[in-house]
């Protein structure tokens, strides 16, 4: 197996070719925050919290999907990186339900933890805030899109089970993860099964 030599915050580490920056950082013992990442399930870089600086890249890159190259120098905690993460958190909170005290994840919330670490509150961006009614349309799921941060973890896990009942719908500020229609489900399951038959993951 071909190994690549990189540095993460000055720490030298060797990782297999094809490894991501996130994997290299973890091998070096460096923590990079993530909200959407789930190894081998949801590696899409949707949340943008894992951005880092890397030599050879034109701007900040998402560590969970960006592959390392030989000799790459990665910086995970520069002022530029911290500012980008803070802005991303502020944007997430701009449309987020801030009733943390009544939330079952309060004090065990990845978003809450990162907001405290980066000094983020809910007032950086004001404007239109979509609101959603609780979705009790199935006996198996209760959806509260007011708390959804669009990480798409639920979508990835659902698709892995070839259920495809949940998906990202609409666009822009109206994007939400919600139940697919029967037609959307059939189309998505057909696509997933076709890709599996062809060996595409």
Model-derived regions: residue spans:
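N-terminal cofactor/phosphate-binding cores enriched in small/glycine residues
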Residues: 4, 11-70, 79-80
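Extended, non-catalytic structural segments that build the interaction scaffolds
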Residues: 9-11, 143-144
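Fe-S ferredoxin-like electron-transfer domains
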Residues: 48-52, 57-193
């Amino acid at each position: 197996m071909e190994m690549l030599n990189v540095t993460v915050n000055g720490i030298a580490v060797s990782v297999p070719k094809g490894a991501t920056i996130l994997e290299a950082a973890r091998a070096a013992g460096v923590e990079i925050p993530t909200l959407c990442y789930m190894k081998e399930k949801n590696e899409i870089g949707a949340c943008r919290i894992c951005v880092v600086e890397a030599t050879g890249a034109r701007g900040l890159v998402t560590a969970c999907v960006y592959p390392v190259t030989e000799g790459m120098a990665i910086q995970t905690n520069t002022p530029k990186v911290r500012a980008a993460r803070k802005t991303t958190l502020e944007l997430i909170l701009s449309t987020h339900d801030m009733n943390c005290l009544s939330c079952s994840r309060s004090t065990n919330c990845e978003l809450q933890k990162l907001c405290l670490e980066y000094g983020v509150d809910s007032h950086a961006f004001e404007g239109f805030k979509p609101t959603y009614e609780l979705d009790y349309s199935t006996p198996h799921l209760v959806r509260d899109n007011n708390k959804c941060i669009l990480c798409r973890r639920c979508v990835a896990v659902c698709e892995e089970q070839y259920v495809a009942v949940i998906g990202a719908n609409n666009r822009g500020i109206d994007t939400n993860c919600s139940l697919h229609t029967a037609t959307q489900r059939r189309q998505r399951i057909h696509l997933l099964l076709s890709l599996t038959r062809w060996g595409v993951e």
